[in-house]
Amino acid sequence: MTEQYFAKQPSAESRPVETEFTYRGHTLRLMTDSGVFSRGSVDEGSALLLESLPELKGRVLDLGCGAGVIGVCVGKVNSIELTQSDVNRRALALTEENLKRNDVSGTVIESDGFAARMKGRQL
């Protein structure tokens, strides 16, 4: 059976790969990896979601962030307080790296999405 993306510690061998994605005039350099959703490229569903988003303000939660693609994109073009969360530790490391690579501010939290585990944050 194929490992799911919600494994805390993916057993798939790490094989990081860089991809580029242009969002609203900004070319973003993103790292992806095995055991994390959409290795190697931004999937069509995420691209469609990003394309349809309005301008965002205030607090934004990217729950189940994977490599952080959606949060990094919206954080690059909006003045927001970004929190990205995932249960997958490899995904969280990629999210932190992708925030830094693209000069986007955000908080990264390991969580399965339950409010009690969001370290008291109101989102």
Set out the residue ranges of the language-model regions.
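Well-ordered beta-strand scaffold positions
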Residues: H26-L28
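N-terminal auxiliary segments of SAM/dcSAM-dependent transferases
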Residues: M1-R24, G35
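Short, glycine/acidic-enriched capping/hinge loops at junctions between secondary-structure elements
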Residues: S41-D43
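Class I SAM-dependent methyltransferase Rossmann-like catalytic core
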Residues: T32-R39
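Conserved SAM/SAH cofactor-binding pocket of Class I
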Residues: G45-Q122
